[in-house]
Amino acid sequence: LYDNGVSPKLLMSGDHGREHYNEVGAMKRYALERSVPSENVFMDHAGFSTYETVYRAKEIFEAKKVVIVTQEYHLYRALYIARQLGLEAYGVAADVRTYGGQSMRDAREVLARCKDFAMCLFKPEPTYLGDPIPVSGNGDVTNDE
């Protein structure tokens, strides 16, 4: 998507709530290894849930239009949340293989959809907000290493 010009900036979101657990750092390294310039990769270190990720994409990173890339079973919920929070949202399934334990993830997804339906009704703030970091700027401001 980046190479084809669909998205000029990438926002990597995930859990980085512990010192030695850094999902977004691994995602950024993956993008850099594929020649995406560092300044075009933003890291959301506080994406502790899908709802919080999307909320922060809009409020902290000031995204207006997003392309969400995730596993297919999860994509429908992510798009629902984005649209409920007022984003123009499109989705791409990132499944590259069959994953073991999918029936457990599917069962969890049913519960997560119920939770996020309620979250979209009441729209609570995420665990962490903060100063704006416009995705139109330089992604290196989100580096922590």
What residues fall within each predicted segment?
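A structural signal for short, hydrophobic/glycine-enriched beta-strand patches
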Residues: 1-107
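Short linear elements at protein peripheries
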Residues: 124-145
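A general structural signal for short secondary-structure boundary/capping elements
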Residues: 90, 112-119, 135-141
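A transmembrane-helix-recognition feature enriched in membrane-embedded lipid enzymes
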Residues: 106-129
